[in-house]
């Protein structure tokens, strides 16, 4: 079963990107603050009879210089945020990275490009941008969640290193949940906004884990993760309910499968008709076959 053409969760991903931008900035700042200071070389011993250089007055360290052109270029990129401007934004972002490879905004640019490449289904470019963002900040929640979610939805078991990539996606989602549990509230978000942004990210992480375990046919853990995600999801995901229905049906928990399919059928989209048909099948099985054991 392939979900390569099923992207009912992309709306949730887009919401996550918007809500999670402040989370991304927060984790970036937090990560930078946690980095150990670079070791300074030991002072050269002073010649005999002369004062040690370490005792001499030291000039204060200069603040990083701000390049007005760099700031302007980033603002132009940041403000080009309408969905129909994706091609322009990609061009601006790629130009920015070439011209300002050491900019303090590089991580945010890569994270935004990751989303744009995903929207265009240029997955190789998406993964490359994500890897570069995580190389700068391994705690970027948005990047961790999105890449961990996308891979199991586009999983190909015949791909080289398919299981390795599933394991990498699993590690990203688990790390994202760990970061979220410790994340301080950014100053520019209210308590309510922060809670919603965290729930959005956590819901997508649980959804990603659910699909990863589904690909491994670990249905019990998959169901647990998908249910955890749906409990806090602002927007229900038809794919998650469909997968739960498939798993519950395989476990002969037909009544629960019918309930999952029914929830899927109520969500407008490509899966609605299929889920309606599956609902009827599961209800029929529930009335004619013995139910499987519950966990």
Regions found by a protein language model. Give the residues of each.
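N-terminal leader/linker segments that initiate helical-solenoid repeat arrays
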Residues: 27-109, 292-295
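TPR repeat positional signature
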Residues: 69, 73-76, 110, 144-147, ...
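Short coil/turn linking the two alpha-helices of tandem helical-hairpin repeats
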Residues: 80-82, 117-121, 148, 152-160, ...
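Short solvent-exposed coil/turn linkers within tandem alpha-helical repeat scaffolds
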Residues: 99-106, 135-141, 160, 181-200, ...
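Residue-level recognition of tetratricopeptide repeat
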Residues: 115, 149, 153-156, 211, ...
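Terminal, low-structured helical/coil segments at or just beyond the last alpha-helical repeat
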Residues: 186-188, 199-215, 224, 250, ...
